[in-house]
Amino acid sequence: IAQCKAGIIGSFPCLNAREGEGEPNMLEIWLKKINEELDKHNQENPDSPAAPYAVNHIVHKSNVRLEKDIDICAKWGAPVWITSLGARPEVNEVAHQAKGIVLHDIINNFFAKKAIDKGADGLVAVAAGAGGHAGTLSPFALIQEIREWFSGPLLLSGSIANGGAVLAAQAM
């Protein structure tokens, strides 16, 4: 919420909204609070609206919560959906029906093309140095390769540790 109020997209992993049997759905509680807080901020600060928030979804077949989680995100109008571990057109369709955009985590050009072919709106290039993730390619090589064929939204993660690296990434 604080990031969004500061003008930066704030995100969280959907699976962090844990719930126990018989307990209220934490994801629903979180999204309600986020929407209320950001709506209030926007009403009080019309000249400085909040940035959108993003919800990260693991779309791998092993995620038994996926269907329920995407229904909740659609209900609350999550504006940005970040997907990873599988390009799933049906998830993209639900996001689009809810007026959201989909950014898909990719580690190479093959998966980038696959994600766009299956309906993602943009890409998150997970490069070497993206703490704990699978990216192995240089961020600058990966961005350059993707930009040869894709002009849509492209985010970069990995090995960006100072202003010079941010400037270099922006130049690409």
Regions found by a protein language model. Give the residues of each.
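A compact, surface-exposed functional segment
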Residues: 167-172
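Active-site entrance/lid segments in N-terminal catalytic domains of soluble metabolic enzymes
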Residues: 1-155
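Glycine-rich adenosine-cofactor-binding loop
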Residues: 153-166
